Amino acid sequence: MDIKCWGSRGSIPVSGDEYVKYGGDTTCIEITAKTGETIIVDAGTGIRRLGKSLIERDITKYYLLLTHAHWDHIMGIAFFRPFLFKKIEVIIQDRKFSGINTRDVFKKLLEQPFFPITLKDLNADIKFEKRLNNKFNIGSVSIETIPVSHFGGALGYKFIEDGKTFVFFTDNELGFDHSGSRGYDAHLKFVKNADLLFHDGEYTKDEYKRKINWGHSSIPQVLDFAEKAKVKKLGLFHLNQDRTDRQMDKIVNKCKIELKKSNSTIDCFAVPCNFEITL
């Protein structure tokens, strides 16, 4: 399974020289199965660049999964160029977001006064499928979901192929259980022994004291969680919109020092723009 990050920034996209390394695009992940299927997770602003890349690579069929429907995870939908072409097939997970199904989320985004093109105007063959929930397969990749702790609800994902596991918890508050969450112990079991975990690392310890119940974790909480879960690689995700490259590098160095103190072998990093890995 090949994994590429097209956006790891939280809440809102950013730009500027101080954000070059980790990037400014919001959440979007591309996963390629060994059988060739393309899986897209979340449609933040990173999906715009991904769309251009898919066209250049002449890939014409994709599966789109969403963790939740907050702005930073869907704001790239209207600018996903493959939607404009007839030869494209997009299979989208059909589920409920605070009582609203996926199709209606798309309809609301793609209508006046927000956007000049409607869902009906798109030329691609777009399907909404309910089977892409709970436990399911896309090609050679087995996928499981779990409700995580986030304001309004969100899903965490586990992707398994050839005994390798990638877990994606982009928006998850480890220090507070929001309504609908399966809880800390269930999350720990879900993540156990993952080869790669991308986890919400929005806040420092001091920042979190002022942001309890906001739906995001502190970095010390994430380190502790990853150690308990015995993951091999930990990628800090949903990077704070004000966090510069220099600040993020300092945080990662501090994380490595803390992990070394506890004799942990976890490879910890912050997920940068265009990060790629094969599991």
Question: Where does each model-flagged region fall?
Answer:
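Active-site flanking residues adjacent to catalytic metal/cofactor-binding acidic residues
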Residues: V41, T67, F168-T170, H199-G201, ...
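Cap/insert and terminal regions of metallo-dependent hydrolase folds
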Residues: F176-I266
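Binuclear metal-dependent hydrolase catalytic cores
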Residues: M1-V167, G175-H178, H187-L188, D245-L279
